[in-house]
Design a protein with these regions (language model features):
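Extracytoplasmic small-molecule ligand-binding "clamshell" domains
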Residues: 20-102, 171-174, 260-261
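Alpha-to-beta junction loops
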Residues: 68-69, 86-96, 139-140, 179-180, ...
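Periplasmic-binding protein-like
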Residues: 40-41, 112-124, 204-247, 263-282
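Extended ligand-binding regions for polar small-molecule ligands
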Residues: 28, 53-66, 122-125, 129-148, ...
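N-terminal export leaders
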Residues: 1-3
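Ligand-binding cleft/hinge of the Venus flytrap
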Residues: 59-69, 73, 130, 135, ...
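Acidic, polar ligand-binding/catalytic clefts
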Residues: 60, 64, 69-135, 146, ...
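Ligand-binding clefts/hinges and TM-proximal coupling segments of bilobed small-molecule sensing domains
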Residues: 8, 20, 148-169, 244-282
């Protein structure tokens, strides 16, 4: 069966199910038996083809809660990712997507995180809280181009000594995060600023481990903290409600999963959510 024929057959079956259910007009092409997630094939700590990322594990958890089988469609998370995955019906949910991005419809957020500074132990930068800290003036800082930290660095006159890494790469061949960590280890840069999940994951696995400082005290105009949910097609309203329910019912377990990957997660007052704070909850 060709891919097109398969899609048409799936579409026809969905139409029949919708009619049998007394559907009022909106058509949802969500597989009733398979939790069809999509992600990047090589983008740890989020996902990889071996199923080792926290988004992979979250998909496993939610599939089990629904009693569904799990399947994954992989595509490099660069330009065209949403269109090539959700848009072409290769999957029914993108497991991690920032609020405010209008390419797809979002669920409620299941975590909140921020950009973070990563430094070596003994660097004298371990307690830097903002990009405006005078100690960064003469430092060579690694930063991913066209991200909020690069905007704040420009506002503070820090780009002259910065080393820039590309925002969009084919993750099957390159990793800006790993390149930054390698440069920090070799002394090519003095510190780096990464998206929080990457900063936490890679800092914990470095040898020796690096210090991660979430930039929660940053007061510049560019937003540094974001809520992350899941993305579905705009037509899939009932599916979105199902995912919202699952997130609410399993938030504590989701938090534990994120913490196990050293992801810096924050509550709405920017206080860190840690294993210790979770243990104190009733």
């Amino acid at each position: 069966m060709t891919a097109l024929a398969g899609l048409l057959a799936f579409s026809q079956a969905a139409r029949i199910r919708a009619q049998q259910a007394g559907d009022s007009g909106s058509l949802e092409l969500v597989d009733p038996d398979v939790f069809r997630a999509c992600g990047d094939p090589r983008n740890m700590p989020f996902s990889n083809e071996k199923g080792e990322g926290f988004e992979n594990k979250l998909a496993e958890l939610l599939a089990a809660k629904l009693g569904k089988k799990l399947s994954y469609a992989y595509f490099p998370q660069a330009t065209g990712f949403v269109r090539m995955t959700l848009g072409f019906f290769r999957c029914d949910v993108i497991m991690g997507f920032p609020q405010g991005d209008d390419q797809a419809q979002l669920t409620i957020p299941y975590y909140r995180t921020t950009y973070a500074l990563i430094v070596k132990q003994g660097s004298g930068l371990e307690d830097v809280a903002t990009i405006a800290d005078p100690r960064l003036k003469d430092k060579r800082i690694g930063v991913v181009a066209r991200t909020p930290p690069s905007t704040v660095m420009a506002m503070n006159g820090l780009l002259a000594h910065a080393k820039s890494y590309p925002l969009f790469v084919d993750t099957r061949a390159d990793s800006s995060a790993q390149a930054m960590l390698d440069d920090l280890a070799s002394g090519e840069i003095d510190c780096g600023i990464l998206w929080g999940p990457m900063a936490g994951y890679y800092a914990a696995r470095a040898n020796p481990p690096l210090v991660m400082v979430p930039l929660v005290k940053e007061t510049a105009a560019a937003p540094m903290t974001f809520r992350i949910g899941m993305a579905v097609r705009p037509s899939d309203q009932e599916w979105k409600r199902t995912l919202n329910r699952l997130i609410k019912e399993n938030q504590a377990e989701i938090n534990k999963l994120l913490i196990s990957y050293n992801i810096p997660i924050l509550d709405e007052s920017n206080a860190p959510i840690t294993a210790e704070t979770l243990s104190k909850e009733p």
